[in-house]
């Protein structure tokens, strides 16, 4: 058989042309050390900051330190099976979590994996956990309220949709209680809630979930849990994951509320990671970028304009503005608000609700210090009726606290001072509220109205709360039309004021409290 050289070359050419070879180019390196969930890797030349890395056993990590001859990464999850010499591959992806309405009513971890035993989440979309906050042009000023249902907050420290309001205080003084009451009060108000639990005991998180289930609040709530037993990496990532889940609703013209409970634990977790990565420590051993840790998170809470929503949804949603309201929680040590993390977060947020252990122990709950607590933008969002009635309350309380300090030393007080002290005692009593019992707008309005117009002045202090409760029941049965008008208009007309005066006089005459 004679072979023609031209035939051979044609045959080889056709074979080469028909060859389909696809090369999957992936950079890989070698683990050189593993310490407390922190891995040093040699040989990853083109890895990105924040890129996902693939380890053996379907384990992933996050590249945080890019050094000249090595990469420092943090493992997401278990790391006991990773050892020196293991191969690490780059993925070319950044960390994403599932987002969407499928997450509502579920309890998930910091990576969006369900941990409530109710099966898979089946979310259709995922989104990056680190995102740039909307620019100034796309934002709108805060103008709609978030009703917490707590008398002292809604009257003196109002919160608006798109605001960042800090809840700050020592341990065990009611910070989580304020946050949970706010979630419970959103029933039927078209507000999706996200509760991010960071570094808490698993039993405490379970109690919160159970209470939300009992009150029917879990139907519109997502719980993101990174308990104390989880790695520092998960506690560091949980707030960003929760924020991304909230942004899904904000960017589609809906309203969402996110609670970070608490950011002190996140700062501790980040400090631990940074020290293990051998980053230089600064004040209180925190790394230099701990301010940026919280600012880039809290700046993502905003009220965005109709144009932003329309642009984001490619014209599917028109004429609707969206909002993400943030209530970060910070735990102080012995009331020290001048520590590093508290001062950082106070400067980032639009106001703070300051809770005091002394007030809590004195039975004044919620233990809000009216003098130090402030809402810088919430006043514009306060409902008309509450704004009209709450001005006097704050002044009364502030003057009462001032006078009460002097009255300890003064033996004989003039009539005006004595009256002011008596009024202050009754207002303080009126603002007390049991946990898990948030009030509607009309109930708050009626309480403030009775205090402002002197209907509590001749009552014993111990009778103030029974009087308030009895008054609400009386109005429900005898003046349902008045309640409906206040609730619908969120205002108090002259006729309604006259009707309320008459109702209060009748109720007081009856003595049914």
Swiss-Prot record:
Task: Tell me the GO molecular function terms.
Answer: ADP binding; ATP binding; proton-transporting ATP synthase activity, rotational mechanism
Q: State the EC number(s).
A: 7.1.2.2
Q: Name one Pfam family in it.
A: ATP-synt_ab_N
Q: HAMAP family in the record, alphabetically? A: ATP_synth_alpha_bact
Q: Which residues bind ATP?
A: 169-176
Q: State the reactions this protein catalyses.
A: ATP + H2O + 4 H(+)(in) = ADP + phosphate + 5 H(+)(out)
Q: Which organism is it from?
A: Burkholderia pseudomallei (strain K96243)
Q: What is this protein called?
A: ATP synthase subunit alpha 1
The question of whether Oxidoreductase is a record keyword is answered with no
């Amino acid at each position: 058989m004679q072979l023609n050289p031209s035939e051979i070359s044609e045959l080889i050419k056709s074979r080469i042309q028909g060859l389909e070879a696809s090369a999957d180019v992936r950079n890989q390196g070698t683990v050189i050390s593993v310490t407390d969930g922190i891995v040093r890797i040699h040989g990853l030349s083109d890895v990105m900051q924040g890129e996902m890395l693939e380890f053996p056993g379907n384990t992933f990590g996050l590249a945080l330190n890019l050094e000249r001859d090595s990469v420092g990464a943090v493992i997401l999850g278990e790391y006991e099976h990773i050892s020196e010499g293991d191969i690490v591959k780059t993925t070319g992806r950044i960390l994403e979590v599932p987002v969407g309405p499928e997450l509502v009513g579920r309890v998930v971890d910091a990576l969006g994996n369900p941990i409530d035993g109710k099966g898979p989440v089946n979310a259709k979309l995922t989104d990056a956990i680190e995102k740039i906050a909307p620019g100034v042009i796309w934002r709108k000023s805060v103008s709609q309220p978030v009703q917490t249902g707590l008398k002292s907050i809604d009257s003196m420290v109002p919160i608006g949709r798109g605001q960042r309001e800090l809840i700050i205080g020592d341990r065990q003084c009611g910070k989580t209680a304020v946050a949970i009451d706010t979630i419970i009060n959103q029933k039927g108000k078209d507000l999706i809630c996200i509760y991010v639990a960071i570094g808490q005991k698993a039993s405490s998180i379970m109690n919160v979930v159970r209470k939300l289930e009992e009150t029917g609040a879990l139907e519109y709530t997502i719980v993101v849990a990174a308990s104390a037993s989880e790695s520092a990496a998960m506690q560091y990532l949980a707030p960003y994951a929760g924020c991304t889940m909230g942004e899904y609703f904000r960017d589609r013209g809906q309203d969402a509320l996110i609670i970070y409970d608490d950011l002190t634990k996140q700062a501790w977790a980040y400090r631990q990671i940074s020290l293990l990565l051998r980053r230089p420590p600064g004040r209180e051993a925190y790394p230099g970028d701990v301010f940026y840790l919280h600012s880039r998170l809290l700046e993502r809470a905003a009220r965005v304009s109709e144009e932003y929503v329309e642009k984001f949804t490619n014209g599917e949603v028109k004429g609707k503005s969206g909002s993400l309201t943030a209530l970060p929680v910070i735990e102080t040590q012995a009331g020290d608000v001048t520590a590093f993390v508290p001062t950082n977060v106070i400067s980032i947020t639009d106001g703070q609700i300051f809770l005091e252990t002394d007030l809590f122990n004195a039975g004044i709950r919620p233990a809000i210090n009216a003098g130090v607590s402030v809402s810088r933008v919430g006043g514009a969002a306060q409902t008309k009726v509450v704004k009209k009635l709450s001005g006097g309350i704050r002044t009364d309380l502030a003057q009462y606290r001032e006078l009460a300090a002097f009255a300890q030393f003064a033996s004989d007080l003039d009539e005006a001072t004595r009256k002011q002290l008596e009024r202050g005692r009754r207002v303080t009593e009126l603002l007390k509220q049991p946990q898990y019992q948030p009030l509607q707008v009309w109930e708050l309005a009626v309480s403030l109205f009775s205090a402002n117009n002197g209907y509590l002045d001749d009552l014993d202090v111990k009778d103030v709360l029974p009087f308030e409760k009895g008054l609400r029941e009386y109005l429900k049965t005898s003046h349902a039309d008045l309640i409906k008008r206040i609730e619908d208009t969120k205002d108090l007309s002259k006729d309604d004021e006259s009707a309320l005066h008459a109702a209060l006089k009748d109720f007081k005459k009856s003595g049914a409290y």
